[in-house]
Amino acid sequence: RDITSWPARPDLLPVLASSLSAAIIWNIFTRRMGVPTSSTHALVGGILGGVIAGGGMQYISWGSPKMIYKASGVWRVLLSLFLSPFAGFLAGLLLFKFFAFLLQSVSTRANKYLNGMEWVLVPMLAFGHGANETQKAMGVIMLALCAAGLSQGAEIPLWVRTISALAVASGILSVAPLIVRRVGGIYKQRPLHGFISQLSSASIVLFASITGGPLSTSQVVASSIVGVGSAERIKGVHWQVARDIVRAWFLTIPAVAVFAWLLHMLLFRHLNLFL
């Protein structure tokens, strides 16, 4: 809701329709291509493009970037999105250095315990991912309900929470093999690498969920793997794969914004759908 200052009235519904349509189509396309892009970036880009097409720049709450911890509006969202991968990289790099030093005299039997820790860290990461993603889903649903006059926005109904949780859970279950292989191909990992990347990713995602900072879990995981790989052997990192992923991250917001703008102009301005 920080992105737009559009009043909660019916003419917001076409804006949301074009915004979400653009984001969904982009996500389906990149998923088919096996590119691990960010659904959060797509949603932000879609809302920006839809709002600009529907009402103009004056309805964008740009906010202020003066102080990171006091940033507001679009700047707050963008700072969270683009700083979180750097946090993942640094956490992966520093934690690997620390644990590699700590475990240097430990035998390979420690791998069994590191693998066992995955049973704790993976659920932590999944919980943080779900908590972060469902907040965005609920925000969009509540915007639509308020615009349609079906809610005052004072409290999020249980059915909205339930639908959002089920949607995110079903999305996690529908694994995209190409994306899994792409992220896994950044660096050849052993138990210590997996432990560090999961620990750093879970910590950052949980912190962002608690503080209300939107981020992309896939970004954080991928950047933490790059950090872990760089800490051990920088030449072992498949930088071409990492570069392709980063390009997709930076391309998503402007590409989806333009797509949402075009959709809105075509469907709601020229064809007058739902108006």
For the regions a language model picked out, list residue spans one by one.
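Multi-pass alpha-helical transmembrane bundle typical of ion/small-solute transporters
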Residues: R1-L275
